């Protein structure tokens, strides 16, 4: 499953990215009080989700063999294919619900945007043992459970849209007219947003390599376990930033640039307060959290190492509201390439630069990698926040000058 995970994460990234693109475009139409345009953008988003799902399903199944061999999975190739082929057949249930979730966010229906995700996660946990052990389906059963769980979330969305018919936006294709510019506008944000998530995955691979070089595989195990907790810790701040996509898009469409300024500052303030609380909790309960990943006799020696990692890297959570808000607001404004540029600057340039600097020339080894990640993340996030503040200030100034 580990060899298939990177490909699975690409699908998740594509779904989230295109969902952000749909959210951005639709919210701008809503802000401009163009209901017809918003409905058209909704229909185009739906069609695009189907096209992309089919495309990635065919592509991933076709290239699965050579990709797995390149990744070094030759010895377990048949096991990987047993899981991967079944999983990719269900690509539609992984991508389409995420994109529809972005559409729900655009119309401000947060409950319907998030409820299917929660139901899917719970259904997956329930179905996994049933298909893997109860029905003796093994790896194929794990993939089938993931696909069916996603389908359950999709069916919930279909029920709201086509049975209850009580959504603000129309998903009807009855009077649909194909507009290539609509697709281009969605992809202008969607592709960069998808690439941002791919960059994060690549960064994790590079960090693993650096840790292997300076400290060995034990450091990688510590980082992998600890970073899961940090990833959970940043979810609230990322959630606030995601909400800012819709608000910024609506405000931009309505040419209410002062509200964009308010959105940026409120999102950062709220995100920072939540992140500060999260940071304190992780630091205080680091030992107890570390025990979760080291309760067995084989991994008990990792507990103090994971504890130290969490007590240091919990500081990373504090920087996220600044960078995430800036990136998401730029997405809401339809400036996906700017958002991507900020992510590349922060992750590929600053984080890696400082991680290598502290680990090698300064000779700090493993701890140097972590300090470098903190330094790069802090500087990159602050730069991103300054850039969005300057951009919004110019929008407001240009509007006043034009008036």
Where are the regions a protein language model picked out?
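Short alpha-helical transmembrane segments in multi-pass integral membrane proteins
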Residues: 26-90, 136-191, 248-315, 359-403
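Hydrophobic residues within alpha-helical transmembrane segments
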Residues: 4-7, 14, 47-51, 89, ...
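Alpha-helical transmembrane segments of multipass membrane proteins
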Residues: 58, 66, 99-103, 122-130, ...
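Transmembrane helical elements of multi-pass membrane transporters/channels
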Residues: 86, 120, 149-153, 157, ...
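Helix-terminus/linker motif at the lipid-water interface of multi-pass membrane proteins
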Residues: 68-74, 130-137, 201-228, 232, ...
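Small-residue hotspots at the loop-to-helix junctions and early N-terminal turns
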Residues: 2-6, 80, 84, 143, ...
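Short runs within selected transmembrane alpha-helices of multi-pass transporters and secretion channels
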Residues: 19, 23, 86-105, 113-124, ...
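Small-residue-rich hydrophobic transmembrane alpha-helices
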Residues: 1-57, 94-113, 222-286, 320-339
């Amino acid at each position: 499953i580990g060899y298939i995970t990177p490909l699975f994460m690409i699908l998740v990234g594509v779904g989230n990215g295109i969902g952000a693109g749909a959210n951005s475009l639709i919210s701008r139409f809503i802000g401009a009080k163009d209901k017809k345009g918003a409905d058209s953008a909704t229909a185009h988003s739906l069609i695009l989700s189907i096209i992309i799902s089919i495309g990635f399903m065919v592509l991933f199944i076709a290239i699965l063999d050579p990709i797995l061999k390149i990744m070094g999975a030759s010895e377990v190739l048949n096991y990987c294919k047993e899981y991967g082929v079944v999983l990719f057949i269900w690509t539609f249930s992984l991508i389409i619900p995420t994109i529809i979730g972005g559409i729900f966010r655009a119309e401000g229906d947060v409950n319907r945007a998030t409820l299917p995700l929660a139901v899917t996660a719970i259904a997956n946990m329930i179905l996994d043992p049933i298909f893997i052990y109860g029905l003796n389906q093994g790896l194929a059963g794990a993939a089938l459970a993931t696909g069916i769980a996603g389908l359950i979330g999709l069916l919930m969305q279909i029920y709201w849209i086509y049975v209850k018919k009580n959504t603000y936006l129309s998903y009807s294709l009855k009077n649909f007219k194909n507009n290539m510019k609509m697709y281009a506008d969605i992809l202008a944000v969607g592709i960069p947003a998808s690439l941002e998530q791919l960059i994060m995955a690549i960064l994790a691979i590079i960090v693993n390599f650096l840790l292997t070089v300076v400290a060995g595989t034990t450091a990688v195990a510590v980082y992998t376990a600890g970073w899961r907790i940090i990833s959970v810790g940043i979810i609230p701040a990322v959630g606030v930033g995601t909400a800012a996509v819709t608000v910024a898009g609506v405000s931009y469409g309505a040419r209410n640039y002062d509200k964009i300024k308010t959105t940026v500052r409120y999102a950062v303030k709220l995100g920072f307060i939540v992140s500060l609380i999260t940071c304190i909790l992780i630091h205080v309960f680091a030992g107890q959290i570390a025990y979760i990943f080291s309760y067995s006799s084989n991994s008990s020696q990792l507990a103090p190492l994971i504890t130290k990692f969490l007590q240091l890297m919990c500081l990373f959570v504090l920087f996220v509201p600044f960078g995430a808000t800036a990136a998401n607001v730029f997405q809401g404004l339809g400036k996906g390439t700017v958002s991507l540029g900020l992510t590349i600057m922060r992750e590929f340039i600053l984080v890696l630069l400082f991680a290598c600097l502290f680990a090698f020339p300064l000779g700090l080894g493993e701890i140097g990698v972590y300090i470098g990640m903190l330094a790069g993340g802090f500087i990159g996030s602050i730069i991103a926040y300054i850039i969005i503040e300057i951009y919004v200030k110019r929008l407001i100034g240009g509007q006043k000058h034009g008036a």
